[in-house]
Amino acid sequence: MTGNDPFANALSALNNAESVGHLEQTVSPASNEIGSVLEVFYDRGYIDGFSFVDDGKAGEFEVELKGAINECGPVKPRYSAGADEFEKWEKRFLPARDYGTLVVTTSHGIMSHYEAREQGVGGQVIAYVY
């Protein structure tokens, strides 16, 4: 799968693999951003795990799926959200209150919007998953 946006391609590949029932998916090329988002997915229970495989180029991630993702995708353009503004973006991208996760990049790293709200930091919304 090639294109201009490896991040969007990775989320699309996960979405497609989940919809047809695959238990594993290879995501390439690998990047720190994709790895951090996969870590959030793992922490929130959407995937069983992932590992980095060095293929001599950019590398790739082997993702173990568990059928918990109904939909995931990138947020384009990347909207800025203050620590008290996440509810607005939850209403826009998630199907119900407290169902799903927004992935946010902050000055403290990439994390879920729940963690960002607890820490009282804002950032840019880069992805969603439910």
From Swiss-Prot:
One GO BP annotation of this record: translation
PROSITE patterns (alphabetical): RIBOSOMAL_S8
Q: What is this protein called?
A: Small ribosomal subunit protein uS8
Job of this protein? One of the primary rRNA binding proteins, it binds directly to 16S rRNA central domain where it helps coordinate assembly of the platform of the 30S subunit.
* Pfam families according to UniProt: Ribosomal_S8
Similarity-based family = Belongs to the universal ribosomal protein uS8 family.
Disulfide bonds, which pairs?
none
Q: Does the keyword rRNA-binding apply?
A: yes
- What do we know about how this protein assembles, alone or with others? Part of the 30S ribosomal subunit.
Give the record's keywords alphabetically: Ribonucleoprotein, Ribosomal protein, RNA-binding, rRNA-binding
InterPro entries noted in UniProt: Ribosomal_uS8, Ribosomal_uS8_CS, Ribosomal_uS8_sf
HAMAP family named in the record = Ribosomal_uS8_A (MF_01302_A)
Tell me a Gene Ontology molecular-function term this record carries: rRNA binding
> What is one cellular component GO term in this UniProt entry?
ribonucleoprotein complex
